[in-house]
Amino acid sequence: MNAYQNKNITIIGLGKTGLSCVDYLLSQQANIRVIDTRKKPTGIDKLPQNIPLHTGSLNQEWLLESDMIVISPGLAVKTPEIQTALKAGVEVIGDIELFCRAATKPIVGITGSNGKSTVTTLVYEMAKAAGVKVGMGGNIGIPALSLLNEDCELYVLELSSFQLETTYSLKAAAATVLNVTEDHMDRYMDLEDYRQAKLRIYHNAEVGVLNNEDKLTFGEGENQARQTVSFAENSADYWLKTENGKQYLMVKDEVILPCEEATLVGRHNYMNILAATALAQAVGINLDAIRTALRHFKGLDHRFQLAHQANGVRWINDSKATNVGSTVAALSGLYVEGKLHLLLGGDGKGADFSELAELINQPHIICYCFGRDGALLAKLSSQSYLFETMEQAIAFLRPTLQSGDMVLLSPACASLDQFASFEKRGEEFTRLAQCLA
């Protein structure tokens, strides 16, 4: 008999991840109930009709009758109803914990405030280039549990702090916390609380890939890997060499690739490449495959992506910059020939925006702020304008554009105050760029 057969398991949250939990636990002959606090949750039409469903609230009675609760990453463990269940002795885990208990092949785990989707996809592409049967999922692409149905030799998982909170059995072959900057401060008590959730990725990890430029990423206590390697611009195992005006991606004394041969550009992307290379090498992927991937990888949608170019003006879609740290990374080392027209705004999730002030208070940067926290952002710069929507901001700035200028959407905020997702925000920016430019 398997561990879940005939157990009463309540799954909280539908959507892709919730449905993957339903499919997996049905295959394990568990007795399943599903709860979703939304009245009409996504995926309700795909739920088998014989599965009991409660919507609109958390059903405390169901929770207390459970042997186990599989909680959506979107619901905090400190929610009173969940705390009541925990105190009654009910086990509470997430989908990643279910996956880790079942997976038999090596796992590369990637978390961080910024860059994790790019690094996850890079490692995946490096493994593919080496001929490895690799599956990618977690907080990106498909739910981790769905990967169990594929013939994989390696799993590459992007993991959020929310997912790591309810994961206990991860034993990553290689793991990294890319960086730690304020994000989800509406969910965590403070930055340290958020950081500790991230550091869980190192628990029982074989190799930890550390960012030598961010000591907050270093493991501590039981959350430390058995071995570590480091990446940084200088003084690290994986580093950036500048010689005769050219830059090179390095591992120790060996050139990985001249930066000009990589399709990704910008200092923050070079750090992403170094981290991905370290992770890939930690699981045995050779440098030739790594180089092939780096020469062909085009980057991800909504991550500092060229959306449109006309009349000497570049429109850059960085809608995935949903926190301050991501926008700081985009602006650091950014060269613009003319003016930089920066679109900021949305839901800041309680973050401290002050770190942006020094970067954006420059003669060539003009800020156009919108959305729920637009007014707060507008106060940071002496050259700022405030609008209700992004569309109004773009309509206002368009007539002022000159050759050499850049329009950058790097909002430092979540999108949900005005858009269904950061992808929808990026798509709207691209549409406006192309029709108004």
Curated annotation (Swiss-Prot):
One Pfam family this sequence matches: Mur_ligase_M
Gene Ontology molecular-function annotations: ATP binding; UDP-N-acetylmuramoylalanine-D-glutamate ligase activity
Binding site for ATP: 112-118
GO annotations of cellular component type: cytoplasm
Keyword terms: ATP-binding, Cell cycle, Cell division, Cell shape, Cell wall biogenesis/degradation, Cytoplasm, Ligase, Nucleotide-binding, Peptidoglycan synthesis
Compartments in which it is found: Cytoplasm
Enzyme Commission (EC) number: 6.3.2.9
Pathway: Cell wall biogenesis; peptidoglycan biosynthesis
InterPro entries documented for this protein: Mur-like_cat_sf (IPR036565), Mur_ligase_C (IPR004101), Mur_ligase_C_dom_sf (IPR036615), Mur_ligase_cen (IPR013221), MurD (IPR005762)
Record has rRNA-binding as a keyword: no
PANTHER family for the chain: UDP-N-ACETYLMURAMOYLALANINE--D-GLUTAMATE LIGASE
Membership in a protein family: Belongs to the MurCDEF family.
Protein name: UDP-N-acetylmuramoylalanine--D-glutamate ligase
Organism whose genome encodes this protein: Haemophilus influenzae (strain PittEE)
